[in-house]
Design a protein with these regions (language model features):
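Nucleotide/phosphate-binding catalytic cleft detector across ATP-hydrolyzing
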Residues: 1-5, 9-11, 17-198
């Protein structure tokens, strides 16, 4: 008998499914995706901004940070910068300063900027969603799905790179579960999934 929590982190929504196979009890919730929540958090404030955290899905966050950089100082830690682009020079060309993680931590403690932390997984938010189901936050299986393009070599598109990674794995073992990774076995090039697994 097992209790499962499955989370699909998408561009617009985060889908959460709880299932207990002992009594076939299941609950689901569809909420705003983390990237939408973070973009809204950034939009709700004005002025200088410090962004730390890890790589996450980035479309709306990237757009709003590029806009903010036109009117205020935007400083992003190297670890969080991968959300925007893997090319740090490109990020700098948008007027966004990229700094080492240690420098970002010092700036955070100085308190001179509004601070936003990037992450696809907010454990407290997830715990609150599950609390709404009326079940304990304790599972035998916890699965998370997120689209990770990987870190392609220079000159290769993210889409082509991701597809080549998938083809390589599926050619070797042509089953959908080939694309499932244990927490400690996420491939090196999958930064976003590795950040979620931590």
């Amino acid at each position: 008998m097992s209790k499962y929590l499955l989370v699909d982190i998408g561009a617009g929504t985060m889908d959460v499914l709880y299932y207990d196979d002992a009594d076939r009890q299941h609950y689901k919730a569809v909420v705003a995706s983390p990237v939408i929540q973070v973009a809204n958090q950034i939009a709700a404030d004005s002025g200088d901004l410090l962004v730390t955290g890890v790589e996450m899905g980035g479309g709306p966050v990237t757009r709003i940070l590029k806009e903010r950089a036109k009117t205020a100082s935007v400083i992003v830690s190297v670890s969080a910068a991968a959300t925007l682009n893997h090319d740090l020079q490109k990020i700098a060309s948008w007027g966004i300063d990229v700094v080492p993680d240690q420098d970002a931590e010092k700036l955070k403690s100085d308190g001179g900027c509004t601070h936003v932390c990037l992450a696809d997984l907010d454990p407290q938010r997830l715990a609150n969603i599950v609390k709404g189901f009326g079940v304990p936050f304790s599972f035998d299986v916890f699965g998370i799905c997120a689209q990770d393009h990987g870190v392609p070599p220079r000159g290769v598109s993210h889409l082509d790179y991701r597809h080549s990674c998938f083809v390589k794995m599926l050619d070797n073992k042509p089953f959908p579960h080939t694309l499932l990774y244990e927490k400690n076995a996420v491939p090196e090039e999958m930064n976003r999934l590795r950040a979620i697994a931590r």
